[in-house]
């Protein structure tokens, strides 16, 4: 699909080649052998050259403190906000801890949600996934993630939830090796890419 632009001397919409879309990946787990990160890395490999997925680590973020925000926000926070701002869309994969998203992910979203009303996530297309050893796949965490994103307000992709149950049996050597699950996840990313293209089309046609 191409970029849609108006001709210089008419209102005719011209279809031009679209540049490679850039996605930012956020993992809700800090573990070295994180299953959530393994899913992201596998999608990173599978998406090329259709889209570029950069995985950003939330490891260095301090706990959210409004006193430390603003003009002199920590460098790691500024880096996160910049990475989100320059991405066309965001892909989040998180485990489920105690029926909710991980604390590190919630903390990252809290930092990214500020400044209020001017968040870099505002209107940004976001796709969420959860991965868990449990057969439920972290579905309760995903509901919480989408509620938080909608409140910012980001633009969560409206589609059937992508939950990966029994993930510990589907990951090996830091990669998602279950082909059916990988195809399932890639279908969701395709929907994210379509959401991004649709938003571009609306802006170009305005």
Task: Report residues per predicted region.
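Short, Lys/Arg-enriched N-terminal segments with co-localized hydrophobic residues
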Residues: 9-17
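Glycine-rich phosphate/pyrophosphate-binding loop and the adjoining helix
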Residues: 18-24, 65, 155-206
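N-terminal beta1-alpha1 ligand-phosphate binding loop
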Residues: 19-48
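A generic structural motif
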Residues: 48-54, 154-155
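N-terminal beta-loop-helix "entrance" segment that forms/cooperates
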Residues: 58-74, 171-172
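Helix-loop-strand module that forms the ligand-binding subsite of alpha/beta enzymes
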Residues: 72-153
């Amino acid at each position: 699909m191409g970029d849609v632009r108006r001709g210089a001397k008419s209102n005719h919409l011209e279809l031009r080649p679209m540049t490679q879309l850039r996605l930012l990946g956020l993992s809700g787990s800090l573990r070295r052998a994180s299953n959530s990160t393994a899913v992201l890395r596998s999608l990173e490999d599978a998406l090329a050259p259709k889209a570029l997925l950069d995985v950003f680590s939330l490891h260095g973020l301090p706990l959210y403190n409004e006193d430390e925000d603003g003009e002199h926000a920590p460098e790691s926070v500024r880096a996160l906000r910049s990475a989100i701002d320059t991405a066309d869309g965001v892909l989040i994969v998180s485990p489920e801890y105690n029926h909710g998203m991980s604390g590190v992910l919630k903390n990252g979203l809290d930092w990214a949600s500020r400044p209020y009303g001017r968040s870099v996530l505002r209107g940004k297309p976001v796709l969420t996934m959860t991965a868990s050893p449990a057969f439920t796949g972290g579905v309760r965490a995903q509901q919480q993630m989408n509620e938080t994103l909608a409140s910012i307000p980001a633009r969560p992709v409206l589609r059937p939830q992508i939950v990966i149950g029994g993930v510990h049996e589907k990951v090996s050597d830091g990669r998602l090796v279950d082909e059916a699950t990988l195809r399932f996840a890639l279908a969701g990313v395709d929907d994210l890419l379509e959401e991004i293209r649709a938003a571009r089309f609306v802006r170009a046609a305005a």
